[in-house]
């Protein structure tokens, strides 16, 4: 593992089924501070030169375009696309069905269904392309757009935790799983 605290203890890399690793992909094993395991679930595509640091958790059906770099302890949920030459700082979670534009620097959690672009990346709206590709119907898209707009464009000044609580209360039925990774 590429962690200065690593002192030779047994650590692991778990890789699921149907993943594709192109040329020069590097993946670091886990460390003591991250449960000793880096894990990659199923059906992910890692294009040329991708780097996955220690203790990352990568779920299913994700695409990492050329030269994407993940810092340690990053969580990538399901159906995420990260554009080429993008970097994600350590301890960040990227929500399901999100898309990160190429050459972006991600230094904060990214909400599910979001489109984030830039250095430092900003949320630019709903990832409609990804949502449509995954066969969400019009009502589901409307609900997610409403949630996204509520979170991003709240007129009242609230802390992030207060925003999350308010939105959970308002849209509880579909948010439990989709935003459950954001901790108070």
Task: Kindly label every feature range from the protein language model.
Residues 1-122:
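Structural signal for interior beta-strand "rungs" in well-ordered beta-sheet cores
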Residues 5-6, 12, 18, 113, ...:
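Terminal amphipathic alpha-helical/low-complexity segments used for targeting or macromolecular assembly
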């Amino acid at each position: 593992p590429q962690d200065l605290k690593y002192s030779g203890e047994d650590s692991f890399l778990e890789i699921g089924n149907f993943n594709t690793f192109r040329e020069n992909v590097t993946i670091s094993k886990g460390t003591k501070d991250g449960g000793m395991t880096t894990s990659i679930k199923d059906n992910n595509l890692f294009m040329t030169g991708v780097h996955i640091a220690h203790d990352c958790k990568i779920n299913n059906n994700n695409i990492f375009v050329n030269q994407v770099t993940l810092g340690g302890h990053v969580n990538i949920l399901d159906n995420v696309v990260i554009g080429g030459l993008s970097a994600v700082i350590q301890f960040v979670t990227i929500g399901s069905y999100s898309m990160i534009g190429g050459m972006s620097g991600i230094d904060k959690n990214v909400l599910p269904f979001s489109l984030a672009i830039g250095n430092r990346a900003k949320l630019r709206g709903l990832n409609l392309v990804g949502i449509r590709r995954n066969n969400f119907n019009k009502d589901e898209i409307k609900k997610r757009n409403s949630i996204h707009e509520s979170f991003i464009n709240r007129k009242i000044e609230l802390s992030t935790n207060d925003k999350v609580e308010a939105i959970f209360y308002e849209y509880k039925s579909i948010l439990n799983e989709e935003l459950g990774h954001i901790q108070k």
